[in-house]
């Protein structure tokens, strides 16, 4: 960071005037000025970059004379600029405009634009390694009071030239829209602008909150851009099919078409003629994949978060042993789109099993074949946009010549059970694609000089053209002369060639010699040798003869390149026609890469994963034996305690888990969600045996950490998440609730937790897991047979009862209650609270712990005394039978009393006296424990 470029601008005042005349971009956008081999930013953007990249404002320089009229500016090297670009687009969700002045002074214009969902212009600067495909989505809603809320979306991953549309009904919390954002892994969302401060649309505000919760960048566009007037004409220019766009069924989705119109304008697709006739339009069906809400995404740790240190902290990091960038991106997509069709899941499982059982097949795929595959989607994109070079053609060729290796390895599978599935999904497709690409291979072999690749030279074969052949001969002769000069120098200096002294083609100095730094002394004070530069790897130097040869060589190389450039253009043009085939190949290899990665994880886990049995949708039960949390078991210093899980419709569809803090409740309920998701993406699962039903959604309510930053209290965030769950859950959902009702008073919190639990059990009837500290909630199991109580166990040694006999303070300390958490989940209720134990674990001051214990004991004494005074606490002093019997006896007395007093002749006092008399006469009623507790006369 120390070697920042110096701020040198030709016409300072002219640039300041120009910069200040530019319109404001708003907080979300940043302007960068490209000045050749360095970059600058100015004004507020300079301050932002100084704080974000350099972490100090001392790097800001003033352009112009004084602070008053000057312009705060900051400079960046190419490396720092690229680092900032990644940070701004991937983490901060900013839009970037890059300005350049191609034809000299003060002729600035925007040459590149980028945003989190549109990285096309800056792919080269970013280096092409992204976790997921940058998907950008536009959304338009219709929420009239008389109609149901309808949401229309259009989305695109610009790198694969596909437009997806979808239109669906939604509830007032937009749960379906949230599920869609997560399914697609959207990075940026285009919404309509509010008309003004006075006319704020509450529906739009809700939409923004959801987009924000999912960590998606927001771009605003005027309502006019969502108009559908020109959309049919635009689509007919973009789509591959020649048929009129108006005949497509998707054009009836008016809201989605409005979104498509805004998206096409935002991406500027129509400005690039290479896009015409290249796009495909498809309709996305929300119901074909399991739905996940934003809370589930966090609760299950699907994707790496900003705070995740180790790779294995997220499921994506754990499962990502992909060897290709396309494989990693497909894995990211699969994790957000778990399948709902048992047949499709089993197909994937069968393929995973093939690679898991055959170690040789798996290792040769990973180490020999997949490792050498470049990012074919990005490569294809370079061809389509006319940016490809001969090097890109060679990279495509190198993939083609490796295909027979893939096919041969797959054909070597002997087991009949796996042979057919592998043939269907991979071998046959690869054979067909390999045949289609044979012509590309032949063309490269006849036109490109493959021998020159060893020197990292990408040139056309000299035999292909007479003038090239003549220049090549001269170049070869010069190369020989250089080698001779090198040999002479090595002998003269007494250095061993290729060990101490080297001949290299340096990117700045051209052909020159290099000595290791330890041997560099031998050329000092020797007039024959001219030193070029000293770098980490040694000292570069040359001789007058070598310098002359190098100049001639460079001159001839330029001639060669000029002569071959038209031939190169032809070769690149022919290779570009193979883009659709390369994209199909990319899809097959990405699928293969993810499946092999699943197999690798399943075999290399601390305890191997097993293939789960999947029941058809709407049937069966979920039974997991010795289940483990996949991310937790691979952490260092963790010995994971396994637990069994049984979820059946009639007996245990709602599990209430009580127990001490840090006892493993959260891990237990989350691991069930993670295992269900792993099973539905076709992966093996961390159990000793497993059978699962298919869930249509996983909905979670877990800790809300950053809600205050968005102006929402923790309790409010909790209620919003829960409302979302209750509105979007169906009978086939899996609900995970980790604590509920903690952010309010104990009584309100318990009331809400009870009511919500009862609603899930009675009205929704889905599978649910509820970890709670409200021990009273366990009474639900007495009312509903499908509610089961579980608790996490703890071993308690020592007791407090006999401490008053012990006089020695040390002995007292030894005798105090020791709690050992066992992390085992057992049936039944946990009858104690362990909050103070956790305080002891984290070394709270002794004084605070003692005070807490005293207060807790006082409260317990007060409660028990209060209950005794009232004839025993509810649910403690009498049985269910007592309640039924007491109620019946009381009813008889009241009916008898009612018959006597209905004539209306008695006064109020006489009526009360008569009722007391009847009660006193009934000995059975007076002896009933339940009646004693409710007696109020």
Curated annotation (Swiss-Prot):
Coiled coil region boundaries: none
UniProt-listed Gene3D superfamilies: 1.10.1420.10, DNA repair protein MutS, domain I (3.40.1170.10), MutS, connector domain (3.30.420.110), P-loop containing nucleotide triphosphate hydrolases (3.40.50.300)
UniProt-listed Pfam families: MutS_I, MutS_II, MutS_III, MutS_IV, MutS_V
Compartment list: Nucleus
Sample GO molecular function, one term: mismatched DNA binding
GO CC annotation, single: nucleus
Keywords, in A-Z order: ATP-binding, DNA damage, DNA repair, DNA-binding, Nucleotide-binding, Nucleus
Residues spanning the signal sequence: none
Binding, ATP: 659-666
GO biological process, one term: mismatch repair
Record's subunit section: Heterodimer of msh2 and msh6.
Family: Belongs to the DNA mismatch repair MutS family.
Job description of the protein: Involved in post-replicative DNA-mismatch repair. Binds to mismatch-containing DNA.
UniProt-listed NCBIfam families: PRK05399.1
Protein name: DNA mismatch repair protein msh-2
């Amino acid at each position: 960071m120390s070697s920042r470029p110096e701020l040198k601008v030709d016409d300072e005042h002219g640039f300041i005037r120009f910069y200040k005349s530019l319109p404001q971009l708003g907080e979300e956008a940043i302007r960068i000025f490209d000045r050749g081999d360095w970059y600058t930013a100015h004004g507020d953007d300079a301050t932002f970059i100084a704080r974000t990249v350099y972490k100090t404002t001392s790097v800001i320089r003033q352009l112009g004379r004084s602070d008053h009229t000057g312009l705060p500016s900051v400079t960046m090297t190419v490396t720092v600029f690229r680092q900032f670009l990644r940070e701004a687009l991937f983490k901060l969700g900013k839009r970037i405009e890059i300005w350049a002045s191609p034809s000299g002074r003060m002729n600035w214009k925007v040459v590149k634009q980028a945003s989190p969902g549109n990285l096309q212009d800056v792919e080269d600067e970013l280096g092409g390694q992204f976790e997921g495909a940058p998907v950008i989505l536009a959304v338009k809603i219709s929420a009239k009071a008389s109609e149901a809320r309808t949401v229309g979306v259009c989305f695109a991953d610009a790198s694969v030239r596909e437009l997806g549309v979808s239109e669906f009904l939604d509830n007032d919390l937009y749960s379906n829209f949230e599920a869609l954002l997560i399914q697609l892994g959207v990075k940026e969302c285009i919404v309509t602008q509010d008309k003004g401060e006075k006319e704020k649309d509450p529906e739009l505000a809700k939409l923004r909150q959801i987009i924000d919760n999912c960590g998606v960048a927001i771009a605003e566009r005027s309502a006019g851009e969502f108009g559908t007037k020109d959309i049919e004409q635009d689509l007919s220019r973009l789509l591959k099919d020649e048929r009129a766009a108006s005949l497509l069924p998707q054009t009836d989705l008016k809201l989605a078409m409005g979104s498509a119109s805004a998206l096409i304008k935002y991406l500027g697709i129509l400005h690039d003629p290479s896009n015409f006739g290249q796009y495909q339009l498809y309709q996305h069906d929300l119901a074909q994949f399991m739905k996940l809400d934003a809370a589930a995404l966090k609760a299950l740790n699907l994707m790496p978060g900003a705070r995740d240190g180790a790779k294995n902290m997220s499921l994506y990091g754990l499962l990502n042993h992909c060897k290709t960038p396309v494989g990693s991106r497909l894995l990211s997509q699969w994790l957000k789109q778990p399948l709902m069709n048992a047949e499709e899941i089993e197909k994937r499982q069968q393929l995973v099993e093939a690679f898991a059982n055959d170690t040789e097949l798996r290792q040769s795929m990973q180490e020999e074949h997949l490792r050498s595959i470049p990012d074919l989607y990005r490569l294809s994109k370079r061809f389509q946009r006319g940016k490809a070079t001969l090097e890109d053609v060679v990279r495509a060729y190198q993939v083609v010549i490796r295909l027979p290796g893939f096919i041969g390895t797959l054909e070597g599978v002997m087991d009949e059970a796996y042979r057919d599935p592998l043939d269907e999904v991979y071998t046959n497709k690869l054979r067909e694609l390999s045949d289609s690409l044979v012509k590309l291979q032949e063309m490269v072999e006849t036109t490109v000089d493959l021998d020159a690749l060893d020197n990292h030279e990408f040139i056309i074969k000299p035999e292909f053209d007479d003038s090239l052949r003549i220049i090549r001969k001269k170049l070869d002769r010069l190369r020989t002369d250089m080698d001779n000069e090198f040999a002479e120098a090595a002998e003269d200096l007494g250095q061993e060639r290729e060990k101490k002294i080297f001949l290299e083609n340096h990117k700045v100095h051209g052909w020159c010699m290099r000595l290791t730094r330890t041997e560099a002394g031998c050329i000092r004070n020797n007039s024959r040798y001219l030193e070029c530069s000293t770098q980490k790897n040694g000292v570069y130097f040359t001789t007058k003869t070598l310098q002359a040869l190098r100049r001639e060589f460079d001159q001839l190389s330029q001639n060669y390149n000029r002569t071959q450039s038209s031939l190169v253009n032809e070769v690149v043009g022919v290779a570009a026609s193979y883009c659709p085939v390369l994209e199909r190949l990319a899809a097959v290899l990405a699928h293969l890469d993810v499946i092999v990665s699943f197999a690798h994880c399943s075999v290399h886990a601390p305890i191997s994963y097993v293939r789960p049995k999947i029941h058809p949708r709407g049937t069966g039960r979920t039974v997991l034996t010795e289940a483990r949390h996949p991310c937790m078991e691979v952490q260092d210093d963790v010995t994971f305690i396994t637990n069994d899980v049984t979820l059946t419709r009639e007996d245990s569809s709602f599990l209430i888990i009580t127990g001490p803090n840090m006892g493993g409740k959260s891990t237990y309920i989350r691991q069930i969600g993670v295992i269900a998701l792993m099973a539905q993406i076709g992966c093996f699962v961390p159990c000793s045996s497993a059978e699962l039903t298919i869930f249509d959604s996983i909905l979670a309510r877990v800790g809300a950490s950053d809600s205050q930053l968005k102006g929402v209290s923790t309790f409010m965030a909790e209620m919003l998440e829960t409302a979302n769950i209750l509105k979007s859950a169906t009978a086939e959902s899996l609900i995970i609730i980790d604590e509920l009702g903690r952010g309010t008073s104990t009584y309100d919190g318990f009331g809400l937790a009870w009511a919500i639990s009862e609603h899930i059990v009675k009205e929704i009837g889905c599978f649910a897991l509820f970890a709670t500290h409200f021990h009273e909630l366990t009474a639900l199991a007495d009312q509903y047979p499908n509610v089961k109580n579980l608790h996490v166990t703890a071993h308690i040694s020592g007791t407090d009862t006999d401490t008053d006999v012990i006089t020695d303070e040390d002995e007292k300390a030894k005798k105090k209650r020791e709690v050992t958490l066992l992390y085992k989940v057992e049936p039944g209720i946990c009858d104690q609270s362990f909050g103070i134990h956790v305080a002891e674990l984290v070394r709270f001051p002794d004084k605070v712990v003692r005070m807490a214990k005293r207060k807790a004991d006082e409260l317990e004494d007060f409660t028990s005394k209060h209950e005794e005074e009232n004839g025993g606490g509810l649910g403690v002093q009498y049985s269910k039978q007592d309640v039924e019997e007491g109620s019946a006896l009381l009813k008889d007395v009241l009916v008898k009393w009612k018959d006597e007093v209905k004539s209306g002749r008695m006064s109020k006092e006489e009526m009360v006296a008569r009722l007391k008399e009847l009660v006193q006469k009934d000995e059975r009623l007076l002896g009933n424990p339940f009646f004693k507790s409710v007696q109020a006369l």
